[in-house]
A protein has these predicted regions:
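N-terminal capping segments
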Residues: 1-60, 65-73, 129
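Residue "hotspots" at secondary-structure boundaries inside conserved domains
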Residues: 55, 96-97
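Solvent-exposed, flexible loop/coil residues
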Residues: 24-26, 97, 140
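Surface-exposed loop/turn and secondary-structure junction residues enriched for glycine/proline
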Residues: 23, 60, 79-80, 96
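Aromatic- and glycine-rich peptidoglycan recognition patches
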Residues: 78-95, 108-155
Length: 155
């Protein structure tokens, strides 16, 4: 659908451009001028907590930004409550029903990404803001064990 295509194209706007930042959120339409600015990580629960690093997004913050921007500032999936809340706003589906725009999760909702397409062999590709790469990246589905369809989509 056009809606799904726009979600993926919006996600691709940040590919390779925004650092991973534990607790990083942004409800700014378009580029957030704070991205890349050294800031202290104030959210607890990470080895980076208390350190200063370039501001960016965490995994769920990336999802929030994508849906917020795609909807023109009208929609935040999970209302900013992190990957677990985002998962709660999805209907479980099977992997073979995956479509671009669906959300994928690590066990325990410890990480979230967006299905962005398929490679030439038909394997799912995921766009996500990854701490291991310190950026928005496209990878395969390694580590992702659950998939859900956001209720945002009308089909």
């Amino acid at each position: 659908s056009e809606e799904r295509k726009q979600v993926v194209l919006t996600a691709y706007q940040l590919l390779g451009k925004v650092n991973y930042f534990w607790g990083g959120k942004s409800l700014v339409l378009g580029w957030d001028s704070r991205w890349g600015t050294p800031m202290e990580v104030t959210a607890a629960g990470s080895s980076s907590s208390g350190t200063v690093r370039p501001f960016g997004l965490d995994c769920s913050g990336f999802i929030d930004w994508v849906f917020y921007n795609q909807s023109g500032g009208q929609y935040i999936i999970g209302h900013g409550g992190g990957a677990s809340a985002q998962h709660n706003y999805c209907t479980p589906i099977s992997w073979n029903n995956a479509k671009p725009g669906d959300l994928v999760f690590y066990p325990g909702d410890s990480h979230v990404g967006i299905v962005c397409g398929f490679d030439s062999s038909g394997n799912i590709l995921i766009i996500h803001c990854a701490s291991s790469s310190d950026n928005v990246v496209v990878t395969g589905k390694i580590g992702f064990t659950m998939i859900g369809r956001p209720r945002y989509f009308t089909e």
